Amino acid sequence: MEEFKNMKARNIGPAGMSGRVTAIDAIHSNPEIFFVGGASAGVWKTENGGATWSALFDEQPILNIGSIKVQQSNPSVIWVGTGEGNPRNSLNLGEGIYKTLDGGKTWKRMGLEKTRNIHRILIDPTNPNTVYAAAIGNPYGIHSERGVYKTTNGGETWERILYTNDTSGCAELVMDPSNPNKIIANMWQHQRKAWNFNSGGPGSGLYITVDGGKNWKKLGKEDGMPAGPMGRCGIAFAASHPNIVYAKVEATKNGFYKSEDGGFTWKLVNSDPAQITDRPFYYQEIYVDPKNENRIYDIHSTVTYSEDGGKSFQTMIPYNGIHPDHHAWWIHPTNENLIIEGNDGGIGISKDRGKTWRFDEQLPFGQFYHINVDNEIPYNVMGGLQDNGSWRGPAYTWIDGGIRNYYWESLWGGDGFDVVPDPTDSKWVYAMSQGGSVGRYNVATGQTEFVRPPAPEARKKMRFNWNSGIALDPFDNNSVYFGSQFLHKSTDKGTTWSIISPDLTTNNPEQQKEETGGLTLDITGAENFNTIMAIAPSPKNKEVVWVGTDDGNVQLTKDGGKTWTNFRGKIPGMNVGAWITQVQASKYNEAEAFVVSNDYRRGDFAITVFRTKDFGKTWENILANKGLKGYALCMVQDPTEPNLIFVGTEHGLWVSLDNAKTFQQWKNDYPSVSTYDLTIQEREADLIIATFGRAVWVLDDIRPLRAAAKANGAAQTTKLKVIEAPTAYQANFRNAPGYEWSTWGLFEGENRRRGAMLSFFVNHAADTSKAKADSAVVKFYDDGGKQLRMLKVKADSGLNRFYWNYDTKGSRFPGSPKPRPGANEQGGGWPVYPGTYKMIVTLGKFSDSTMVTVKDDPRVPQPRAVYDAKKKMFDRLQVSADKLTAAVDKIVDAEETLTKMEGQLRGAEGKDVDSLRKETTKMRDEIKKIRESIFGRTASDRQGITRYADITTQTILGAARQEIGGKIAAPTAQTERLVVEAETAVTESVNRINEFTSGKWAAYRKLAESTPVKLFKD
């Protein structure tokens, strides 16, 4: 969408609650430079220990990161494995391994696309073209592209060197620091289904090679490993004593093992379940202090450490320290005090061996499940994040600077999901955490009300999804819907509930067993199944409600819940049992709905959004063969232009301008990130984008897209088209709280620019005359046709966007440079009063116009009488200021003449010349005195600060100007006095200049004309 290149979304954060970090590596010779990979955030680099960051991977087609490895012999070479190795229900899959040769400026994919998830990369330090990749594979799929892969030619070709079966991947891969051919791998058999996870099986185990993977030995009971099935294992060599190796082993009985012969034989040293392996499927990594073979770090829900070789562990980072759920760990190989760790909420940095930690608040890695908006001015966005609760923050602010982390307010704990503002009182929101824990929260007071629907009877078990469906009734502000296996409705904001449906799921007992985990149970509600995920009441018919379930049912009632129709197996192209992630009821047609489904959890990556226009009699997959990438996650149809449709997929944002006939990816600095939810703030026509990995983005004012969609995406036939303007507010901006000054380390999301946001399209190809005009002239008029302001703005092909600060034509300040021919008109005049103004844009011989509505700050409206009185006084004062400017121009011209005269006199001789030279110096002195009376003394030649407190014409004029513009109230007698004083001072200065030019300057000119120097011209 090149024609919209000047229309870019703003990333507003937050970063105070970041997201899952899966990979960390640093340059050993300069550890201030390190790299962080987010589960779905891309690769980020800091060159100053975390003070500032830059994104390195945003131009790539995928941002889901599993591993990072820097080639220490040449740190410009970096390898990145995509697809995270933490196979929870919300994992993000990958598409191969990437390599950069220039420190991340450019990247090349080096294969292994079908492995889906690469959890670890090793580089042979003696031969960096030899690289190993641990492919953990797709936990939802059964496929052979798993195990350990090796390249000996820098990634040009790969060989799979370790494989056990189609559900086993490599979960850990470690290299002996003293022998790069000696590697230990953990092969892990595991499989995830939407309702179940199983860890362990015959494909699991520890394998060791001493010849770079040509031959492997599986370590068994005879080697000290546990008998029976094994699961996920963490492995770590002690760099200071490489014969010492540790393994954290998931088995029938989990244990911590130690080898003292380099990994060939093992002994159990700890099997205390309170200390070992709480959630091995999600985190099972261990690390050894590089200088102390007995000090071990175990990263899991918390971080614990051992000082006695694993016999006992104590807490280093508690559950409420930094953030729980730790996935990545890096220790400097020669400075054991420097540690960087990654968790579900970002990264922590320690420089004292873990005694204290600094949380980095600049990485906007938030994984949002949902997004919503209220109707405040400025409006707020709100939503819930994976493992980071639910939050509300401003889409833009009337505060100086950017959108800071502490502008965001925590609403609800746990894993956060949908947040819905009360339409009658935006201080109240509905918010929830996992498993249907829904409540109402007052943002102003913190008052909380839990409103989860009760079971219909005491012993009836309710099933709530990890991410339960909720929706407001568009016809009744007091009514809300909520989903379990039933559809619940409350007509009193959740105080009481009624069930208005039967069980709308498949209600399959085999999918409700709560036995998930395999060798180690992990029953957290993440695998709750046969539940309602999506609820969509029609805004056109109060009796119509659509429901989508996680087990593939699409249900419809047309009578308020009395009867239901299930479309399971009746939607051509939709797999029976596919996950229904979203349903959208049309704002245009009560019979129309969109169903967003995906089936990647069963290995099918088809991209599907189905539409019906006849209550489900017929269906169409509107994404079929349209070139989109990544399975579909969400969609929204514009509420005023039906041709405009947005779709979010696992790999970015896509836009249709022709009612889903075609789609294009929206880039314009927006990355190919997992785009999880979309909504439109209707009053301001903003698209709000919730990403699962890069927090929240706002695409301001989508009216240009509406205009293009109105033409079905066809090319503009005229050279110039002005777009309808959004309402603009003359807002007062307050000072930012918290910090007066700050260094690096303070995150600021991008704020909306000040001023009226205005847009126009240019199609240079439509001008057959080929007349060149690279800038447009913009003029603003009041309702009486008076021109108020003129601007010149750049006119690129495609969309152009600029901002008007509500100012009228201004005047030059006394002594300021005269404008160059063709320069932009002087701005800074008295701002316009709230109202409607006409804007005409002219490009060559083409013109188009629109109306611009300017509104007052709703917090502090200004009465028209006050505005008029202040403007009248300002205009009166400006008359004097203009007189002074014109007068000062005379002495500026005289100074320029003196400079030229001094140049001509330099080196000249003669009595007349000497006399003229003396008079020239006198003229300089005279002008200096005049200048000082108007502007004050200039800085001394001596060193130091010189701020003279001179009372001058300029200070008197400035005091009057400040009195008018700096006061809220209408002008007073005090204002009148200051203006009169300014007028008097200006008159005195103008008279003094006129006396000088008609007297001493005229005499000087006469003297100069009598000499051979011919400078003056009539």
Language-model regions, residue ranges each:
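Low-complexity, Pro/Ser/Thr- and charge-rich linker/hinge segments at domain boundaries
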Residues: 704-734, 851-883
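Glycine-centered tight-turn motifs at strand-turn-strand junctions
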Residues: 575, 787-828
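Mature extracytoplasmic or organellar-lumen-exposed domains after removal of signal/transit peptides
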Residues: 852, 886-1018
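Beta-propeller blade termini and top-face loops
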Residues: 1-746, 753-756, 763-765
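Beta-strand-rich binding/interaction modules
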Residues: 439-441, 758-759, 766-789, 836-840
